[in-house]
Structure formats: structure tokens, C-alpha cells
């Protein structure tokens, strides 16, 4: 399938493909994801039943979240449109001994092939990288069984998020490669809630994600003005 046939920005794929080889290096370009991952997984596990559940990790990258969910007993399918990252994710399974079904595939394509196949869908740090986030959310809703849960994380479109995620993380501290984020694609919670409603889902919980890059400490907070987590439910 060509890039034009799916909800993808080729420039975004190129950014992440360039760092595929060091995805599992906790001191590399994916360092913030390594630091945030345990906190995010704990937040997810406190809200949805993972053991035995069929879980989708959309935009799985090199598999950080997928493996953590599989370690908690979930039956995980990880999808990403960057072949280099899927290859890294598959190779890392030889080290971890975990079982994850990795595929080079987009959510829209998977929704056509396997509608209502998942109990839980996770979409972390992806929605701000696609050209049509509403289409992505509709596909994720279609992939969920009635009563299923959707977990998202993204960046709020606020001055504080611009300073922290772009000026700070990319330009000053160089924690992320320059150009990783585009401020115009950051999403306010109210915008996310509206898109979820249009997709037939309901936003039920928001939480902020705090991160101190120098100490590499991450935590859940009440402030959602930079990075935030969201839980939505499909009726049923």
C-alpha cells in the first residue's frame, strides 16, 4: 500500500526511521519514551484489565509499550508504518522472550480487516504526527469491541507545551531531534473530546504527565498543559 493511501506523513516516518537502530538505547533519541513508559503503563494497568485482553498498540515504534503490556499478560498486536522500527521491535523479542504480533500496517487498514477485534487500543505519542487525527480516531473506535477502552497520550497546544516540548526538549536540551514535533499538530483536550464524540466514543478521564529531563523523573499529575493521558470508552 502506498503512503498516499494511508493516514501518514512520509516526513514523519523518516524522522523515526532515522533513529530505529537506537530505539532500545535508554540514552538515545528515544530517551524520554524510556523515562515515561513505566508511568504510562502503570496508569493504563490501573484502568483496564490487561491479562488475557487483546490489546492494540497503534504507532508501536520499536516496541517499548508493546513489550511492557505483554509482560502484564496482554495479547498484544503492535502496528507501525515504519518498517525499520517494526524490524527493531521484532528483533528485541529475541532478548525479552515476550510474544507480540508486530505488523507494518496502519490503523485504518487494520480496521477494515479486523473490525471490533480488540478489547483495548493504545495510541501514545502518535496522534500529533498524523495528518488526519480524526480519521485515526475513527479507525481506532472501529477496532474496539463494544465497551472497549482507548488510551491516548499527546501534547496540549499551549505556550507551555511549546516551550517545554519544542524549545526545551529539542532546541536547548537536545533530548529529541530538532523537528520531532510540530506545534500546529498539538491538540487541546477539548478538541480531542470532540473528535472522540464524532468517532462514537466518550472521553472519561484526563491526566497530566510530568517529566523532569535532567533527573529523568516522570509522574502523573493534574496539570494537562503539556503532555497528557486520556481514557475513552466505546459504548456497549
Predicted regions and their residues:
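N-terminal, positively charged/glycine-rich alpha-helical extensions of SAM-dependent methyltransferases
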Residues: 1-24
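Conserved alpha-helix/loop element of class I SAM-dependent methyltransferases that forms part
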Residues: 34-51
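Conserved class I S-adenosyl-L-methionine
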Residues: 53-59, 151-173
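Class I SAM-dependent methyltransferase SAM/SAH-binding core
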Residues: 62-109
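A short acidic, Gly/Pro-enriched loop at the edge of an enzyme's catalytic core
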Residues: 111-120
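A short glycine-rich, Lys/Arg-flanked "PGG" loop and its adjoining helix->strand segment in the class I
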Residues: 134-149
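Acceptor-substrate binding/catalytic loop of class I
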Residues: 174-191
Amino acid at each position: 500500500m502506498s503512503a498516499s493511501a494511508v493516514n501518514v506523513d512520509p516526513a514523519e516516518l523518516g524522522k523515526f526511521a532515522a533513529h530505529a537502530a537506537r530505539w532500545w538505547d535508554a540514552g538515545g533519541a528515544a530517551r524520554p519514551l524510556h523515562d515515561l513508559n513505566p508511568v504510562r503503563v502503570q496508569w493504563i494497568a490501573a484502568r483496564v484489565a490487561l491479562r488475557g485482553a487483546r490489546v492494540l498498540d497503534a504507532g508501536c515504534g520499536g516496541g517499548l509499550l508493546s513489550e511492557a503490556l505483554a509482560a502484564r499478560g496482554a495479547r498484544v498486536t503492535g502496528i507501525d508504518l515504519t518498517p525499520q522500527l517494526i524490524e527493531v521491535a521484532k528483533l528485541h523479542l529475541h532478548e525479552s522472550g515476550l510474544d507480540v504480533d508486530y505488523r507494518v500496517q496502519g490503523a485504518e487498514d487494520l480496521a477494515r480487516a479486523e473490525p471490533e477485534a480488540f478489547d483495548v487500543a493504545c495510541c501514545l505519542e502518535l496522534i500529533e504526527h498524523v495528518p488526519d487525527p480524526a480519521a485515526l480516531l475513527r479507525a481506532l473506535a472501529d477496532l474496539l469491541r463494544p465497551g472497549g477502552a482507548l488510551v491516548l497520550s499527546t501534547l496540549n497546544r499551549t505556550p507551555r507545551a511549546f516551550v517545554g516540548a519544542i524549545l526545551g526538549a529539542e532546541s536547548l536540551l537536545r533530548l529529541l531531534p530538532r523537528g520531532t514535533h510540530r506545534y500546529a499538530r498539538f491538540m487541546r483536550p477539548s478538541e480531542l473530546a470532540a473528535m472522540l464524540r464524532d468517532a462514537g466514543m466518550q472521553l472519561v478521564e484526563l491526566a497530566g504527565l510530568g517529566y523532569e529531563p535532567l533527573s529523568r523523573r516522570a509522574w502523573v499529575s493534574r496539570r494537562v498543559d503539556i503532555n497528557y493521558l486520556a481514557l475513552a470508552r466505546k459504548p456497549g
